[in-house]
Amino acid sequence: PQEPSSPDYDSHAYLWGLGSVVSAFNAIVQNTDNVDFRMTYESRLKETLLKYYNTTKEPMCFGCFVNPHDQRLYDDAIWVGIDLADLYSKTKDSWYLDYAKSVWNFVLSGKDDELGGGVYWDENAKDSKNTCSNAPAVVLALKLYQITNDAAYLENGKDIYKWTKSKLQDPSDYLYWDCIKTSGKIETSKFSYNSGQMMQAAVLLYNATGEEQYLTDAKLLAEACYNYFFENFISNSSGEQFRILKDGSRWFNAIMVRGFLELNKVESNGTYMIAIRKSVDHAWKYTRDAETGLFFKQFSGNDITDNPGDILAQGAMVEFCLLYTSDAAD
């Protein structure tokens, strides 16, 4: 994962960061009955998203920046599309579904037979196919299938899932590599959100098809994620000892936790849920800046050296706090 390379890049205004705000808004709408909150912020959210909607390229979709000539990354758009699909399911506002479908059309434009299938990461470069542009594409496809009952979404989701598993899963530990280059070279870095999205995708496919292999995939991946992306921890602040989400990107970890929560709806596992709850509790109590109330990037709080305010971290913490208290976490 990397920040966009476009000369139009603005670290303070880009779709990836905005997407975490959309996820935070979605988490609040999904898990509370706060109508006033929705009425206060919904129109502003829509207006802001439309500033990123690129109508100069086909198929039309959200771009990385507020610029009609900007870079468009498939994964950045997909994260937004997933939240829009969720928001439609909750509110029945057709605006959300229309734009979620436009994201899907954009995804299909990035899918071809190079390397046997899969979705590219960058619309312009088309030099790699990444787990981060394929795993969430499956999640979006299955959410649209749930909404529309259109079998084309299911078939595309199954196809992309099969390709991603065959090309990007490490058979030694079930976790997912970062990407495969068009040259065939595999970038072997492992990030929590990639494996977490394949976990969620597997559960959604199991729900849609009833095929046990998908549930088996999800359970194996959950155990692998728990072993790799959590660690034993003693808090300098409280002295408590527990398994905690490893330091790194809070946003990556929030995306991974979506997979754990999806699986927990089907087959509960207290070990995973306790680790997530304790991680979030600790982060809430001990990793906030006293002056601003904003969160640092690190989860442990043992060695805070970064500045608070990273928008991805803030959006992730809103999602964490809402999702881990939801019915899915029971």
Can you describe what each PLM-predicted range is?
Residues 171-174, 206-309:
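Non-catalytic carbohydrate-binding regions of carbohydrate-active enzymes
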Residues 75-78, 82-86, 91-123:
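Extracytoplasmic mature domains of secreted/periplasmic and thylakoid-lumen proteins
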Residues 2-83, 89-97:
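N-terminal carbohydrate-binding/catalytic regions of secreted carbohydrate-active enzymes
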Residues 324-330:
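Conserved small/polar residues in nucleotide/adenosyl-binding loops
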Residues 140-189, 196, 201, 208-209, ...:
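Noncatalytic carbohydrate-binding groove/subsite architecture in carbohydrate-active enzymes
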